[in-house]
Amino acid sequence: MTNNTQHTFRKKWGQNFLADTNLLRKIVRTINPTVDDAILEIGPGEGALTERVLPLVKYMAAIEIDPKLIKYLNGRDDLQDCHFIHKDVLMQKLNSLPIPTPIKIIGNIPYNITSPILFWLIEQRAHWT
């Protein structure tokens, strides 16, 4: 499968990208981002959620494992204020990432890594809200 950027979805990472604008609006409303928030987005994909949250917060970073998506995201002019990190989130410690605390964590997480990410978050509970 491909989408409008011609990015080939990578099965090994369980990639799926948000495209439904109504769903994205609901997610942003649920997140309720504020001007004081520092946000870490896990798996930004093509940046559909990123582009809606970024203008509403003080600081935003997004961690993405796919090098092709990192290149694409870094090339988007509308996302220049977001700090993109090319790493596997499960191999990171929140306090080592360049993000002010406390951190709010958001993401469209693939099913195949939901449990590992939840356990990763629990281990690092002191660093996020």
Please state what every model-predicted region is.
Residues M1-T129:
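Catalytic cores of RNA-modifying enzymes
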